[in-house]
């Protein structure tokens, strides 16, 4: 009988992560959860910014329902201040929840998550720490930043239309396609932005978008209260 823990770690590419970043290790965690601790080193650069060779002490927390739940990451060496893109409890703000979910849906690999989400964040701080501009840009605080990121995902310029698009994404395809497109074109969605919305809905499911509308903690709607006023980094690929 296949050990379910070993099978889970194989699906997540846990061994590949620990083999590539040899100073990371698994540490004790509550049953069903996983915790990775240690030092991660990297060498990376982006166009217009210098190559950075650096290392950080981090902790990565994987919930029992990973990859449905986004991993939580801390820098534990006392180097990154609370004022730099942090969530509650000192977790790193790696990007918008929807952007991170899209990455995890494509692959449950924790190696992929570290290289696409964690290292770009650490690289950005290394640049910022020495007076440079953030290489991947940043989002505004609170709900506005989440709308800005969604506008980027949807390929639209008007972030005020985002809430309407999310409502359409929370519906079934057939129902949504019969309704007016949220872009203001006066065309029904089925003749306008349907391809991009269908791709997002197929990736994350309409329940994900319904949760953005219904949960105050998601801080997505214009009038939702914000319990954490942080700024998110935008994510991008870079050479390493």
Predicted regions and their residues:
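Acidic/negatively charged segments and metal-coordination signatures
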Residues: 1, 98-107, 111-240
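N-terminal membrane-targeting/insertion segments
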Residues: 1-8
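Compact alpha/beta protein-protein interaction domains typified by the UBC
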Residues: 10-113, 135
């Amino acid at each position: 009988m296949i050990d379910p823990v070993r099978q889970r770690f194989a699906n997540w590419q846990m061994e590949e992560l620990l083999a590539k970043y040899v100073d990371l290790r698994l540490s004790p965690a509550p049953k069903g959860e996983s915790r990775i601790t240690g030092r991660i080193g990297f060498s990376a650069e982006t166009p217009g910014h210098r190559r950075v060779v650096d290392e950080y002490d981090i902790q990565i927390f994987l919930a029992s329902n990973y990859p449905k739940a986004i991993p939580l990451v801390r820098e534990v060496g006392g180097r990154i201040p609370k004022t730099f893109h942090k969530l509650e409890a000192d977790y790193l703000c790696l990007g918008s929840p929807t952007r991170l979910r899209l990455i995890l849906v494509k692959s449950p690999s924790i190696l992929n998550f570290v290289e696409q989400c964690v290292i770009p964040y650490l690289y950005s701080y290394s640049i910022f720490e020495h007076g440079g501009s953030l290489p991947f840009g940043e989002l505004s605080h609170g709900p506005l930043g989440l709308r800005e990121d969604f506008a980027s995902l949807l390929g639209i310029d008007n972030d005020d239309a985002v809430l309407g698009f999310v409502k359409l994404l929370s519906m079934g395809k057939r129902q949504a396609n019969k309704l007016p497109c949220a872009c203001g074109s006066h065309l029904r969605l089925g003749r306008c932005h349907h391809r991009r919305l269908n791709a997002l809905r197929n990736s994350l499911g309409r329940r994900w978008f319904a949760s953005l509308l219904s949960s105050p903690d998601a801080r997505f709607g214009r009038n939702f209260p914000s319990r954490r006023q942080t700024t998110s980094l935008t994510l991008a690929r870079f050479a390493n």
